Every structure is written in C-alpha cells, then in structure tokens.
Amino acid sequence: MRQPGRFVSRLYYAWGVNARAVCYGAMLAVCAGPALAQSAPPNPLLTSPLPHIQPAPQPQLGAGLPNFETPGAEGTLPNAAIAVRSVTVVGATAFAPARLAVLTRGLAGQTVALQRIEAARLALLGLYRGHGFILTTVSLDIDAAGNVRFIVIEGRIVAVKLSQSIGPAGTMVLRFLNHLTAERPLNEASLERWLLLAQQIPGIAVHAVLQADSDDPGALTLVAEVSKQDVSGLLTADNRGFKDAGPVEALAVADLNSMTAQGDQTEVSLFHTEVGTDNFGQVSESFFIGDRGLRLKLYGGAGRANPRGTLGAVHYESFITVFGGVLSYPLLLQRNQALDLSLHFDGIEDTIHIAGIRNSADSLRVARFAGQYAWQDLWAGNGREAQSVLNLQDSQGVPAFGASPDGRTAPPAGRADAKMDFWKLTGSVSRTQTLFSPFGAATVALRAEAGGQYTTDILPSEEQFYLGGSRFTRGYYSGQVVGDKAAYATAELQLNTGDEFTLFHQDIALGAQFYGFYDWGETWSNLKTDLNHQVRSAGGGVRLGLTKNLEMDGEVVERLTTQLEPKVTGTAPLSETVIYWGVTARY
C-alpha cells in the first residue's frame, strides 16, 4: 500500500531544542530575579539536540515486497457432471487429513457437477492462502474411472542467492533470508519479515525475485537483487532557532554503512548555529546481534553553548556530555504493520557556568522502554489509504551509576526540587488519511496528531516536555514552552501533487505538498513557582521536492498566543506573524 501523500510532516525542523530553550530560561532568571514566578524553560544544550533535529525514519511498510494474486478459477468449466469413484488429496503436509476431508466431503460415490469439484479445489487453496501459505498451489486431476485427485504443491524456498557481491554486508543479507529455507510450506508472514529485515541493513537495498525449479515442483530459489551505498549523508538547515542562538541552524550527518558482516553503521553528527553560539557533535555505532533482528546502538557526544544577548552579557556557558545505548527489536514486521520495541539507557552530564563560575550541575541516568506500532489500512475505502503511528515511552530515572543525588546544594541542581529518580510516560498517535483525489494524480489528505507527557514528579530540566518546533505547536521554537506534564494536538490538511519525468537522461521527481494547519498545546508544571502555558497557532506552507534528494520548505504562521510571560514582568509579546524556511539535502 502506498503511503498517503508524497511527503510527510518533517521532524527535523525541531532541532537545537535544548540549545534554544536554555537561552530563554536563563534570560528570565537573570533579568527578572526570584521575586516573580517564572516559567523557566531549560538552558541551552541541556541534552542532545539530535533526537529533535534528525528526520525520524518513516515506517517503510511493504516496500520491495513481491505481490501475490488472489486465487480464483482457472477458466470456464463445461456444464457437465461425472460419477466420482474416489477422492484423494496428494502432497498436503501443512494440515491434518481430517481437516482436508471436511472440504472434499460429499464428492466420493456421487455424481457431481464439475463446478462443485472446482469449488472444493478452491476451498483447499483458500485454506492454504488463508493461513498465509501464498506460494502453495492446488491442481485437479480426474481419470477415466472417476478418481479425483487434488494435487497440492506446497511452495517453499530451497535456496537464496544474491544478484551480485556487495562485500561482507552480503553475509548479513543471507543470514536473514536463509531463515526462509527452513519453512515448508512457506508462510507469507515469514517471507515479509525476513525481506523487510534485510532492507533494514544500513545502506542496503533489496528486491526479491522468485525463480521456480522446473525439476522440483514447489521448489523456489529466492534471488535477492541487492545494491549497496557505502556512504550516505544528510544536510539540513532552517531558521527556527532562538534568536540569541541562531535563528539559522544546521545539521550535518555522515554515515558509513555496513562495512562488516554485522550490518553495522558508523554515524557522525554535527550541529551548528548561525554564529557558532551552539555546537554539538556525536558519534554512534550500531550493529546487529545474531540473525533475528536484535540491534545494538552505542553513542557518545558533547557540546557547548555560549549564546548572545542578555545571556552573553553575563558570560553564560553550558557544557553537555551524553552517552548511552539502545537495544531494539522488531517484534512484528509485516507488509502493512510493524511493532518495534526498544530498551534505552541514557547518561547526561550538564554543567552551567556564569562569569566563569559553576552555577549548576546535573548528572542523569535514565532507563527507558519504548514501543512503536505503525500500520496501514483502507478503512475509508479503496483509494483512500492511511498510515497511522502510535508511540509510547516509559522513562525511569536511575539514582545510581554516578547520578546526582536529590537536594544537593554544591553545586545546586539545574532545577529546584527536581527528582533524579523520576518517572514519566510520553506518547503520541498520528494518522495521515487520504480523503479524495481532486484531479489527476493529486490527493487531498488529513494529518492529525495528538500526544503529550504525564508525571507526578518535578522533573530535571532535561526531561521536561518541549512544545514548539515544526511538527506541532508551530510558530514557537522547540522548548520555548516546557512543562512536566503536557498535551498537544495538531490538524493539517494537505494537497499532494507531483510529476516524474526524464531530463538529460536523469530521472526527475518533482512534488509539492501545500498545507494548512491548526495547532494547540498546553503544559503544566509540578513545581508551584513555575507557570503553566497554553499556546495556539495556525498557518500554512508548502514542501517542495525538487529531486528525490532535495527538499525546500516555506511556512507562514500566525501565533494565536503571543504573551507567554505575565505582563508584570515587562516581557514583550511575540510578533503575531512569523515566516520560516527550510532546506534538506540527502546523499
């Protein structure tokens, strides 16, 4: 099933989340003083900006999988009847004889119309197909004496080959696909799982072709048409940052793909703002463990922020170090649905200096358990495809392995009364639903998303929920409004258009997504001295796909909430209208 629309809402606008939010919060603290209750967003670069910067990979459900026809009658049968002497089913191993006999009952010893015998054949075939045995065939043989034989050929894969050598990475492809040779008959769910897993090997593209063996009915050879991209990359920039740390910001990512037989990926990420006020770098290494799909990612990074403006005047600097690991496993991986589970352990070391003196320090150790379920459906009818994604993450602060103790004073915590052994639950659900086609290949779709965070604890600044960015509550930089608890909702109406053609022997794919949106978000603080906020915005824009590797975006937003701080603080309201741009190039 094709994903609704040519584009999806980008997650990578919302970068530099912490880098910007921190500047804002510290500015309030410096300028307003302790007498006024403030909503103090985190200081710059309190945690890695990368989760808020990089485009989140969209579930590629069913990509590259072979399609199988629905079984039907093989031709028009003559209007005749025969005297059936006996009925046998030959070659069936997947089901007990008693189960098969139910489908052929009433044929033997009777004069039966050919259409009824054909119906029994289709019932046998339907039994196999209904259980996912899509490579199985059932044929019919009737001899002159009236003996009826249903010949079942249970399709199976006996060998897997690669179309070309791709170095050590080919070993990982074969480890996955060779699982298919152990099943007889072959189940569609298994075929889809192992093919989709092979496609998740970094830098590897896989397309399956099945070849029949003329000497062995039912025996198939799977030829994996493979290609490999050793190096891939991403460069993206926009103007959504906080003014004293941007607002122009950029991210460069370089990947070295599958250089060993473990399907590894080495990734280097560099985040940089307009005049170098915020800089962050991270290196990660990921690889498969075994041949079932379990994957481990290890990472480490560091950054520094020294914003301009009021914070620059007091010589504000923040330093961050992050490290950790992620174990992920695809529990369910099929053509139209996928369920991924992951276990995370994150370490964050954050220090803030003002005028060269250490002002606060936090050391966090956090265990997280996360799940993502994605599915495609046709609930609205044929031609109205939809894709939905549900995300849940449970996080628990770990008061060990070097974590800061609660209630410390030297140096103090970055947020008063914050609990290092906190608990929180974060989640979101989104759906992009195709509505209709107004003309040609164009489609109109509705994208809706809702989500938020719940906790009963006063969270460290690094773990508060950030509103703003490019995916929801647009018009505010990511982290401009934060809270221990939060909720948001967004609705976006999209007009998707596109055209593909060849120019100078190059395939060109042009596309445009015009959209209008309305966003709402609200935060609640468990710290009584912090403010709660509600923000709303509306606007529209266009996402232009100039080639398959280059996208340019423009957006106009009307802020419906402009006064984020009490007027008594003297904080000026935000401007009502703001214009954003973005560009992304992939290699």
What are these regions (language model features)?
Residues A254, L544, V556, P573-Y587:
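Outer-membrane beta-barrel "beta-signal"
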Residues T351-W520, W524, K567-T569:
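C-terminal outer-membrane beta-barrel translocator/porin domains of Gram-negative envelope proteins
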Residues G233-L235, D264-V268, L294-L298, L339-L343, ...:
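Transmembrane beta-strands of outer-membrane beta-barrel proteins
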Residues R2, Q38-G241, V253, F271-H272, ...:
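Periplasmic polypeptide-binding modules associated with outer-membrane biogenesis and secretion
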Residues E225-S227, D238, D255-N257, S284-F288, ...:
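Transmembrane beta-barrel domains of outer membrane proteins
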Residues V206, V231-G233, T260-T266, D291-K297, ...:
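Repeated loop/turn-to-beta-strand initiation elements of outer-membrane beta-barrel proteins
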Residues V231-G241, A252, G263-E274, G281-V283, ...:
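Transmembrane beta-strand segments that form the barrel wall of outer-membrane beta-barrel proteins
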Residues G218, G246-A250, T277-G281, F319-F323, ...:
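Residues that define the transmembrane beta-barrel architecture of outer-membrane proteins
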